[in-house]
């Protein structure tokens, strides 16, 4: 109570000055306001704003910018006027009702202009504070911020800010606000280069910080890269690797995955890892980090092992959750369906990383002097074997429940096919047990008989049909019919793909079967092979390439 009594005269004096007729009185009142008004004293700030009025604040700001009638005549006081005006604006906007007012939103373009011309930290910080307070309380403020070249102005100084500074934090919050209101596609169409500069700066924060702002950066980056409109941004980042963003991203991902954090945070990090690989290639996982002033180097294989282990865990958890929701939870409720769709999206990230690691191991396994030693190689193979075993169990569960259609099932077949293409003998008994089922799996949008699942398994099928036992296993399951039907779709008049690689694999697989047809006692379905001959003829006419050996075998 005594403190309030001491402050009352100061507030009264301030209000009298703010209501004064002369500018000198009002200036003195504003100075007094910045001295004693606390940010949480909304009542006093509200009274001060009502006393001074928006018109005088506009005039003071424009004078500080040399835009008023006497703006250029008093250069000595210009900086002081500018500093005072933005400080007062930021102070007033601590009251949400003032910050969200049309008067304050209308000042956003002017404050952005100040930012584009000023490099003095105190002025900049007050400007950023004002922008955040106005934009976070009024959606029109966010729109005005973007339409007034906000992204370009934010991008200009962001790489010069100190790691973890208040300016950097406010910059990230402003970007997040704009993304919540404006589509990333619209933003990148308008200022792609500037947005890539901002993202690179945020990636550095994700790597270098060890506080809550690190996770803010993680969430913001994950949201950006998860957007359907992130393609152009990824391409632009691929053209500007000289600012070390791939190394910073690797450091941040490793820091999250190797520490005890919530599963959701690890999933966000996997999103970033998948993004980095899609831009830089699979070798990003094992590339040595080359950063100036790095005290502790990251071992070349650490990121690879952490990403694989985290992906393996995610696959196991997500498949278990999806199976529960599909087969045991309450059916056909909106919340159940939304949860399944969300988990499918997350599963797609984990599966994508597993496939990329498979490609990486396949490539480096044939190289000499690789950064991956034998011990790491064995760990990766063991991790992949465990992952594929879990996926096969999920497919077995789906088979037992009579489920053949679903994007999660098709994605499971794809990752199994990717691995078995490199190691056809892995999980041999389980694969042959499930082969017929996997060939029957369809995606949600496939209109008729299975196609994609057969294509995903074709590299495996081509390899196992090179020996009699593999052919026997395939024929006994009826898989040879699925292969022929797939080949018809690949080369027919309404071909579903233009991939010559898939066509040749399918042709070789059919040839392997036909060569051994007498031993297999393979019964010929005339109508099926007639359709294939017609399709091959059409394909040969189009590409001037007759696959004669296959045609001869069919007709012999």
State where each predicted segment sits:
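Leucine-rich repeat domain C-terminal region
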Residues: 252, 260-268, 272-276
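Blade-edge beta-strand/turn elements of extracellular beta-propeller
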Residues: 201, 252-253
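Elongated alpha-helical scaffolds that mediate protein-protein interactions in large eukaryotic proteins
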Residues: 1-156, 160-199, 206-219, 226-247, ...
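Eukaryotic acidic, serine/threonine-rich low-complexity intrinsically disordered regions
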Residues: 410-413, 423
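Alpha-helical repeat/alpha-solenoid scaffolds of the HEAT/ARM/MIF4G superfamily
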Residues: 279-401
């Amino acid at each position: 109570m005594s403190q309030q009594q001491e402050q009352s005269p100061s507030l009264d004096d301030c209000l009298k000055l703010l209501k004064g007729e002369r500018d000198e009185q009002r200036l003195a009142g504003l100075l007094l306001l910045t001295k004693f008004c606390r940010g949480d004293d909304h009542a006093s700030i509200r009274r001060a704003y009502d006393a001074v009025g928006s018109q005088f604040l506009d005039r003071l700001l424009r004078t500080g910018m040399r835009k008023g009638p006497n703006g250029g005549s008093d250069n000595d006081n210009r900086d002081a006027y500018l500093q005072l005006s933005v400080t007062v604006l930021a102070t007033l906007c601590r009251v949400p009702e003032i910050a969200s007012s049309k008067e304050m939103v209308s000042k956003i373009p002017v404050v952005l202009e100040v930012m584009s011309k000023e490099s003095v930290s105190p002025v900049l910080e007050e400007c950023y504070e004002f922008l955040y307070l106005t934009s976070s309380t009024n959606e029109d403020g966010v729109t005005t911020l973007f339409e007034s070249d906000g992204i370009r102005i934010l991008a200009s100084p962001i790489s010069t800010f100190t790691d973890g500074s208040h300016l950097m934090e406010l910059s990230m919050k402003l970007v997040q606000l704009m993304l919540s209101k404006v589509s990333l596609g619209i933003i990148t169409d308008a200022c792609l280069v500037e947005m890539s500069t901002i993202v690179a700066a945020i990636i550095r924060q994700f790597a270098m910080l060890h506080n809550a702002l690190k996770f803010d950066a993680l969430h913001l980056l994950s949201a950006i890269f998860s957007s359907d409109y992130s393609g152009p941004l990824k391409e632009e980042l691929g053209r500007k690797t000289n600012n070390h963003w791939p190394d910073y991203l690797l450091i941040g991902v490793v820091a999250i995955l190797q520490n005890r954090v919530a599963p959701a945070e690890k999933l966000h990090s996997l999103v970033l890892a998948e993004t980095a690989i899609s831009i830089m290639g699979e070798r990003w996982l094992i590339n040595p980090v080359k950063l100036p002033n790095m005290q502790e180097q990251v071992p070349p294989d650490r990121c690879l092992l952490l990403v694989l282990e985290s992906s393996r865990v995610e696959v196991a958890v997500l498949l278990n959750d999806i199976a529960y929701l599909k087969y045991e939870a309450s059916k056909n409720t909106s919340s159940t369906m939304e949860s399944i769709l969300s988990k499918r999206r997350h599963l797609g990230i984990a599966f994508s990383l597993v496939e990329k690691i498979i490609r990486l191991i396949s490539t480096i396994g044939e190289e000499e002097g690789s950064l991956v030693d034998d011990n790491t190689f064995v760990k990766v193979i063991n991790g992949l074997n465990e992952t594929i075993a879990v996926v096969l169990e999920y497919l077995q569960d789906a088979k037992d429940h009579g489920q053949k259609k679903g994007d999660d099932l098709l994605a499971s077949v794809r990752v199994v096919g990717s691995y078995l293409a490199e190691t056809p003998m892995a999980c041999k008994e389980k694969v042959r047990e499930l082969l017929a089922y996997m060939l029957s799996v369809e995606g949600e949008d496939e209109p008729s008989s299975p196609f994609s699942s057969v294509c995903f398994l074709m590299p495996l099928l081509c390899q196992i049909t090179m020996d009699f036992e593999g052919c026997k296993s395939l024929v006994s399951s009826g898989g040879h019919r699925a292969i022929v039907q797939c080949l018809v779709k690949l080369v027919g008049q309404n071909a579903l793909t233009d991939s010559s690689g898939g066509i040749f694999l399918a042709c070789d697989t059919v040839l392997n079967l036909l060569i051994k047809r007498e031993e297999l006692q393979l019964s010929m379905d005339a109508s099926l092979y007639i359709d294939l001959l017609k399709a091959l003829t059409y394909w040969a006419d189009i590409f001037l390439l007759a696959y004669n050996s296959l045609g001869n075998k069919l007709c012999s």
